[in-house]
């Protein structure tokens, strides 16, 4: 017997007759009152709900005047409208503050907005005024600040757009001319200046300034950040400071942490995501600042996804949320920036999907999905080449190189997981090793040939770490049958020369330098280590790699 189809066609819901016509089983014209009830001068009621029946009967149960008739119909209409409200209405974002605010509005109490209360606190509290003045006294001269702000915009806004340079430059000019600038804007501008001070290269006027004073750019950056934190941790400021401004501040700092810090957690990214998701979900706002907030949220998602793709860190933001929000990015007047972020979003979404699939699929399931991801990535690469390869401009050239670096990194991540499992479990294991080796070679050559460009835009340290890890992948592939090109080790020599030139302090960079020494003489006896490398002479290649890349953040939420 054939079962009934579950997908039944929905019947058209017909208007029902009034209650009296239904009882009498006669035809009803379904008006109010219907013709039959009107003719018999009886009350006409419809059984939509009992409350509506009572409301409709009430005016007919007492003498009707013009006043009572109009008021009764108005009351009936109002109460019926209330009953017809959608039953699927959802709560908004509810916390203690919104509950108190709603209660106050119900009682007729007019509450002042946090910005006016913050303004009053800054004007009346001498301690807060002094802290803010101390921050302004610490910044460099105005011409140096203007140059640093331009350095920030030229370096960071090319990749992640968080702070509007033209608006920030105007506010800095107002500060210079002693015009009033609100504290939130001052703190964001000074934060951007502090981040710019942490970069490696500066224009000549900034270099001259620091050669004439008794502190370095890094020391000044640390001092500014410390004073900003002290100011924001004041109880009144912490309570009244707008969450969107706090999110912007941590997002600005997170950009720098992503590029310069390797073995420590990006706590500013953690703060920004925590505030954006839990304290004040900016992607749910529908006010006039929605578009600006959405741009900040998308930039935070990009930073989070870049850390996952470039460093194989567990992402904070779920990849499907980021993918859904990408379509809400506005094109605006800068078409090149829109195209860049659109292509970057496609690459990062694919990279996040690969990361999730590696950790949730079986080996065979993931092998079967490789061709799908390869075709996705190939389509994105074709778009990158068509839209960025033949356009002049240093910013555009950097974006082209950056997109290709992310592309080859995502492709490397697609294959590199297979070197952790037995070759007997993987169909076509030699082919996968071959693809992994070729992809890693392409990525290494690209980074090696683009060192100057990456340094100009503040990405050199991150790329040096990435290429060092890629060298390890190539070495493993060579042990499993991949023939490394004879001229490839010139690439390692080029990277090693860059490290020797920069002389970055710290044990991590010393160990990376040691690894590169081994790479450049991979077919010869292990070279003797210089005195600068101390206790590294008794450690083999993989022990050193363990020291460099063995870290675990465990993703704790910071104390808020």
Swiss-Prot record:
Species: Schizosaccharomyces pombe (strain 972 / ATCC 24843) (Fission yeast)
Compartment list: Nucleus membrane
Disulfide bonds: none
CDD domains in the record: GAL4 (cd00067)
Keywords linked to the UniProt accession: DNA-binding, Membrane, Metal-binding, Nucleus, Transcription, Transcription regulation, Transmembrane, Transmembrane helix, Zinc
Membrane topology: Single-pass membrane protein
Gene Ontology BP terms: regulation of transcription by RNA polymerase II
Protein name: Uncharacterized transcriptional regulatory protein C16G5.17
Lineage of source species: Eukaryota, Fungi, Dikarya, Ascomycota, Taphrinomycotina
Positions of transmembrane segments: 182-202
GO molecular function ontology, one term from the record: zinc ion binding
Region of interest: Disordered: 60-80
Main location: nucleus
Membrane found in the keyword field: yes
InterPro entries linked: Sec_Metabolite_Reg, Zn2-C6_fun-type_DNA-bd_sf, Zn2Cys6_DnaBD
GO terms for cellular component: nuclear membrane; nucleus
